Amino acid sequence: MSTNNSTQQQDELDQIKSKIQDNLISSGNYDIINKQLKLQLYESGWYDKVSQIASRELMDHQQEVNSSNSNSSNSNKKNELTFDQLFAFVKPKAEELVPNEVKQDILNRITKYLDDIIQ
């Protein structure tokens, strides 16, 4: 019985989230907040740092592939780094690099938006 109640609550929560998201987009506030986030990340050097992490990982991976290929005669596609693998490596590091001031500012903007639509 509690599983059914939990599922119902999750469905209601998902509906509320969807309505908020739809309103956020249709009101234009999503674009405003998104542009502000991108600007703050750019100004903080976040994009450059994340790009450096990705480039370093690609170079490290390529060096490992070259090293293993020189030790064995068969090179194959298993050595290729996929986008998903690179993304999984970079994502947590990129999230950690978001400056606290940027996180706080964006959270404040979202909170203000929610306060305004709830009233």
From Swiss-Prot:
Coiled coil: none annotated. Signal peptide: none annotated. One of its GO terms (biological process) is regulation of transcription by RNA polymerase II. It comes from the Eukaryota. It is found in: Nucleus, Nucleoplasm; Cytoplasm, P-body. GO terms for molecular function: chromatin binding; transcription coactivator activity. Involved in mRNA export coupled transcription activation by association with both the TREX-2 and the SAGA complexes. At the promoters, SAGA is required for recruitment of the basal transcription machinery. It influences RNA polymerase II transcriptional activity through different activities such as TBP interaction and promoter selectivity, interaction with transcription activators, and chromatin modification through histone acetylation and deubiquitination. Belongs to the ENY2 family. This is Transcription and mRNA export factor SUS1. It comes from Candida albicans (strain SC5314 / ATCC MYA-2876).
